[in-house]
Amino acid sequence: HTTVMKKYILHTLIAVLIGFSANAQIDRSQIPSSGPTPEVNLRDAKEFKLKNGLTVLVATDTKFPVVSWSLNLNNPPVFEGNKAGVQSLTGALLGKETLKSTKDEFAEKVDFLGASVSVNPNGGFGYCLTKYQEDVFSLFAEAAFKTKFTQEELDFEKEQLIEGIKSGENSAAAIAGNVRGAVFYGKNHAAGEIVTEETINNVSLEDVKQFYTDRFKPSNGFMLFTGDITVKEVKKLLKKYMKGWKSGSVTIPEYPSFEDVSTTEINFVDVPNAVQ
């Protein structure tokens, strides 16, 4: 037992000394050099284009029986003005309830297949086992093209968004985020405007429908499929579930020019109800 204990103490001392030695060699005043830039290898991906302008990439990998896809419409930022929040509200409603299924029914269908489906005004994604790829892709298309926009759901999402704004009224991080965008870009820029309770309440159901119609267009976008799926299978899915998606692109807006400040600025925000 004594011999074992001596060996244990010796090993512990060696480990401690190695640790001290390693720490002593680290110069924390110097920024460590970065490692090599990781390479993204898509050389085996097959590319083709649909008639509506959407670029499609297929990277087949049969290592696991799963498939995923992502849709990026490559939309430019949009200034929402006195209806700031319409993009968030549109995204909240998209894919929740469809012309075929209630909100709960749609969620149950996705969960039953052990899949993941999400759609927003700028694209979306899906993930599932290969054997369910057509079932899940049909649900993705249903969410993307057959969403049922209802006043009831819009009112609910407005309440949620307003509650979030109110909860951040005393948050230094939330306040700083709003001020930062406004100072950097100006309040008349997409990255500088502030969503308020007033602008949210200005958004109507027709505004949401129109925002979706104006933004969900394929011509500037691309779609990437990865996993256990072939080009032939992808083309079959797209032909069956996206054949009605007509070409169209989003106009790139013009924003007022802005210049960097010439001197350091300190910006203060008056918060009368702050505890400090």
Which residues are covered by each model-predicted region?
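An aromatic/glycine/proline-enriched structural segment found at the starts
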Residues: Q25-S33, E193, F222-Q276
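Bacterial N-terminal signal peptides
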Residues: H11-G19
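Sec/Tat signal peptide C-region and signal peptidase I cleavage site
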Residues: F20-A24
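Bacterial N-terminal signal peptides that target proteins for export
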Residues: T2-T12
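Acidic/histidine-enriched segments that form metal/cofactor-coordinating
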Residues: I26-R28, S33, A107-F211, P256-S257
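M16/MPP (pitrilysin/insulinase) zinc-metallopeptidase core fold and M16-derived inactive scaffolds
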Residues: S70-T130, G192-I194
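Mature N-terminal segment immediately following signal peptide/propeptide cleavage
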Residues: P38-V67
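Solvent-exposed coil/turn segments that connect beta secondary-structure elements
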Residues: K51, T55, D61-K63, N72-P76, ...
